[in-house]
Amino acid sequence: MTDPLIPAVLVFRDNGTPFSPLYDDIYHSAVGGLEQARYVFLRGNSLPDRWQGRRIFTVLETGFGMGINFLMTWAAWRADPLRCERLHFVSTEKHPFTVGDLRKAVAATISDPEIAALAQALANAWPTLVPGTHRLEFDEGRVVLTLVFGDAQERLPALRLRADAFYLDGFAPARNPELWTPMIFKALARLAGEGATFATCSSAGDIKRALIQCGFEYRKVDGFGWKRAMLVGHFAPRWRVRRHEPPAPLAVDERHAVVIGAGLAGCAVIERLAARGWRVTSLERHASVAQEASGNPAGVFHPMISRDDSIASRVTRAGFLYTLRRWAALERLGHAPLRGGQGLLQIAADENEARSISEAIAAFGYPGDYVTPVSAAEAQRLAGMPLARGGWFFPHGGWIDPASLCAAQCAAAGPLLERRFGVDVARIERSGGQWTVFDTSGEAIARAPVVIVASAHDAARIAGLQHAPTRSIRGQLTLLPPGAVLPPLQMPVIGEGYAVPLADGVTLTGATYELDDPDTSLRADGHLENLERVAQMLPAFANVADPARSTALTGRVAFRCVTSDRMPMIGQLADEAQAALDAQRLRGAWPLDLPRTDGLYGAFAYGSRGLVWAALGAELIASQLEGEPWPLERDLAEDIDPARFLLRALRQGAVS
């Protein structure tokens, strides 16, 4: 179970130095935090020289604290005309500051106006204090900060990245010994790229021994300020110290990808690849974007709360928070999708659920800007009409027009995107490092070194997957005209069903959930089912749940694509043919052991959570493709890996 995130407590010593009472240690040298960062970590890792001429450079830090090392690294990157194209800075933090305390800490420490401006940008982007991985982007996405909130002993082994430099900057080993254990250094060794360097203020004997045991070489140099010595060094193992190599970028002659499908999944991939400079060809069988399940007039987005903080809850939390940042970035670029005001209510199924979920919210320590339990009276005030029960309020949840989101993402891709509609893809073939896409007439219609299949129900067929058990679920929506329910609903309400007040006064309700039902026609019993379920939450809707009136209602039918475990299929696809040949050897395999198909990725089976999964899924695929740090923990990525069903079949001896 996920441990609650406990924020740092900020106090200041008499000399003004930020201090942690939890660890009885200072956050930076009293001689000067900026100078310490420059001397110990930048100079200690030979930066900026080592990133010059590189496309991607990745720094991994243990202990973000108040972010001074990141700010100084960012400033050095900005000042270097030979800087790398994209700087990744990944940092763990068990006790992050609240944004208010972060502002206080940097205000007391930083007088340099350039660094202060960067600190202000960091504070403005500071994530919600919930456990997990939070990816922030600065300088048009060329500087990427990935904050990993939680215990480093648990979080470092869950990272998937190739580090070029390590900043070992936890509190002193005597104050915070858990951050200097052999387990930590083993985790770092697993993540070290070729020639990776490190620097640390400490020169303790235990640390030296742990470094050597894990494949690092060190040397002692003059320390900073009152410290007599510090350690610097590099990764130079004399024997194999890890089972799997860190991720590397796909070697391609041309940065060009074909994306099959232009719904929520495909358009998110288009935007994330184009943001990295990839040329993208979009193939869509319909006449425009978002024509199938992504074409509903509105969709709701919100986190998922569970008593045990399940895998689905963790993936959805990461996706929800990342999605909000991506949408805000689109809006800053002038590509604003149509969405409602902030706020969404989830109504408990009964009093027992209301109590247990409220207890879970308290136990996990979720902050009020993420979720808040509400009574029936409080929920009624927010919704503007009576409710059957209380539940919980998501202040940043809401509704959005999916088609407008897809259009905004394509617009953000600009001239790097070629869009082709009315194209019905039948199959793909790989030869000579290139994928060729064929239509249903057998004609080759596109070629590229990379293909991302984001076509929902057709994805497994196009990719030739045998171990991708997806199914179709029919969903019928019901639209109520303005004034059908009074007083009007003020925000989306979800629970057994959902009701969404749209911008034009129409209220959207839904949706039915009918497995393997291919009927595309609107059905009166479907409208009635939707309204009756909503009426269980919102009694005012009982007046419109009338069988005699249901035949006159309008709506829409769409089909969700889901897997048997209800998790999406996101990431590089396995080479199933090669896995079958190696089935005996792979029977006890882990996901990283599986053979993968070069240049072939999937983004499908999003079910009813496409709005909160698509952006994160696209970022994961782009990161895998580029050899960048993954935007979520490895165990979560494995739970949405398209190869997970192949892996289960191998373990059961069902592949031959």
From Swiss-Prot:
Residues 260-656 are annotated as: FAD-dependent cmnm(5)s(2)U34 oxidoreductase. Residues 1-236 are annotated as: tRNA (mnm(5)s(2)U34)-methyltransferase. It holds the Pfam family DAO. It comes from the Bacteria. Its main location: cytoplasm. Keywords: Cytoplasm, FAD, Flavoprotein, Methyltransferase, Multifunctional enzyme, Oxidoreductase, S-adenosyl-L-methionine, Transferase, tRNA processing. Its cofactor is FAD. Its EC number is 2.1.1.61, 1.5.-.-. Transmembrane segments: none annotated. PANTHER family: SARCOSINE DEHYDROGENASE-RELATED, TRNA 5-METHYLAMINOMETHYL-2-THIOURIDINE BIOSYNTHESIS BIFUNCTIONAL PROTEIN MNMC. Catalyzes the last two steps in the biosynthesis of 5-methylaminomethyl-2-thiouridine (mnm(5)s(2)U) at the wobble position (U34) in tRNA. Catalyzes the FAD-dependent demodification of cmnm(5)s(2)U34 to nm(5)s(2)U34, followed by the transfer of a methyl group from S-adenosyl-L-methionine to nm(5)s(2)U34, to form mnm(5)s(2)U34. In the N-terminal section; belongs to the methyltransferase superfamily. tRNA (mnm(5)s(2)U34)-methyltransferase family. In the C-terminal section; belongs to the DAO family. HAMAP family: MnmC. This is tRNA 5-methylaminomethyl-2-thiouridine biosynthesis bifunctional protein MnmC. It comes from Paraburkholderia phytofirmans (strain DSM 17436 / LMG 22146 / PsJN) (Burkholderia phytofirmans).
